Amino acid sequence: MSWIINGASHDWEVVIGLEVHAQIVSNSKLFSGASTEISVDPNSHVALLDVAMPGVLPVTNEYCIVQAVKTALALSCEVKKYSVFDRKNYFYPDLSFGYQITQFYHPIAKNGHIMLDESADNKKIGIARIHIEQDAGKSLHVGDKTCIDFNRAGVALMEIVTDPDLRSPEEAAEYLKKLRIILRYIGACSGDMENGALRCDANVSVRKVGESALGVRSEIKNLNSIKYVAQAIKYEAMRHVEVLESGGKVEQSTLLYDVDTGTTRTMRSKEDVCDYRYFPDPDLLPLEITDEFIASIRDTLPELPMAKMSRYMNDFSLSRYDAVILSSDRDVAEYYDEVMQRNLPGDLVAAWVTGELFGMLNKRGMCISDSPVRADALGDLLRLMVDGTISGKMAKQVFATMFETGKSASKIVEEEGLQQIADEGVLSAMVERVLEKNPDKVQQYKQGKEKLFGYFVGQIMQETKGRANPEVLNALIQSKLSQ
């Protein structure tokens, strides 16, 4: 949904484009054999190439290309058969080469999209291009000194660039959430923004409602959380409107967002393309990608979140809410799918996974991959409940014991004698005894005090320690009281 800012003289439409830098999951860097592990001592994983030592040439890491092609396919992009690495020339202390190896003229993929608002108008956010590039090092400021850690230098990145299709901070946030889910699903990027594995630059401009030409844009760099992306866009759009409404002119610039003040500040004036003097890297051969190579990667793609969500809603009759929760995390979805192999009701399994299981995991700060109750074990428990061996109340008790001990549901039920009593003869005798002991309450019930029905049920549940089958018991009591 478009965000329209009401100014004193005009209504303004916000136009947003995002550039997402996704760190590729790979054991080694893009052009050197150094490890990509960065949570170690500074400058521990640095090859000669990473610090631009003379005489060392780059060698392309094929696995990074595979990951980029996989991402392109997952985002419905056109994978280019011919792709070239270029040099982007600029100076920065943590960029030893004096240039960044990236792709400008011939990126690896173009023309993809992500769908937003599936429940409403299915808005399509275009992805203009995906290109591969190397990351820079990290500057660390200590007092009046600046130290540089080159562990990150040369790590492979994908820059995923949208068309200027986003129209509000909320749409930008939703796009980022969906992109991160997809990247995690296919294993191309961890998506951990707090660790810098996913960073976002937001391009923001405004224009008068009804105009087609784009306004002058500001680029907000290195936003490391979805919340800050939305906040920064909102502030910058309002600033643009304030400048224009007062008769001023928005200057093209590169900005940083200050999370403490909630404002942007100028980092540098925005460069034009010509300032970077792009040209093909003479040390690297072009990438020539075949149809067979693309097909082999396509075969490795998992069922993607949108398709999985639709399947859950169509095949298992799940609500949209449950389908979104279950499909948004690949580990959760695989857990749910494995439980469903027991031919159980889809809504029942969804309720248990998102309710009982998530509740236990959250209390202990655990993720589903660490759950002591595996998917097959939960399936066995729910099968006992569906088959009538134990009641729903008993199932929760058994589940808690399973979580603490790791024992199977059937073993716990056997050891604790929790099997439901469903024998009509046994329960009928109990019902008769309870009614005979309470003739006054039977009379009151027949005179219209129907709440006493729960009293009779409670007496038998107390006698059986909750093991009486509720359906059988209710039917028997109803039958006896109607005589």
From Swiss-Prot:
Reply yes or no: does the keyword Cell cycle apply.
Answer: no
Q: Which SMART domains match?
A: GatB_Yqey
Name the residues that span the membrane: none
Q: Which SUPFAM superfamilies match?
A: GatB/YqeY motif, Glutamine synthetase/guanido kinase
Question: Which EC numbers characterise this protein's activity in its record?
Answer: 6.3.5.-
GO aspect biological process, one term: glutaminyl-tRNAGln biosynthesis via transamidation
Q: Which GO terms describe its molecular function?
A: asparaginyl-tRNA synthase (glutamine-hydrolyzing) activity; ATP binding; glutaminyl-tRNA synthase (glutamine-hydrolyzing) activity
Task: Keywords in alphabetical order, please.
Answer: ATP-binding, Ligase, Nucleotide-binding, Protein biosynthesis
- Lineage, top-rank taxon, reads Bacteria
**Catalytic reaction(s) noted:** L-glutamyl-tRNA(Gln) + L-glutamine + ATP + H2O = L-glutaminyl-tRNA(Gln) + L-glutamate + ADP + phosphate + H(+); L-aspartyl-tRNA(Asn) + L-glutamine + ATP + H2O = L-asparaginyl-tRNA(Asn) + L-glutamate + ADP + phosphate + 2 H(+)
Q: What does this protein do?
A: Allows the formation of correctly charged Asn-tRNA(Asn) or Gln-tRNA(Gln) through the transamidation of misacylated Asp-tRNA(Asn) or Glu-tRNA(Gln) in organisms which lack either or both of asparaginyl-tRNA or glutaminyl-tRNA synthetases. The reaction takes place in the presence of glutamine and ATP through an activated phospho-Asp-tRNA(Asn) or phospho-Glu-tRNA(Gln).
By sequence similarity, the record places it as follows: Belongs to the GatB/GatE family. GatB subfamily.
Q: What is this protein called?
A: Aspartyl/glutamyl-tRNA(Asn/Gln) amidotransferase subunit B
Species this protein is from: Anaplasma phagocytophilum (strain HZ)
Q: What is the lineage of its organism?
A: Bacteria, Pseudomonadati, Pseudomonadota, Alphaproteobacteria, Rickettsiales
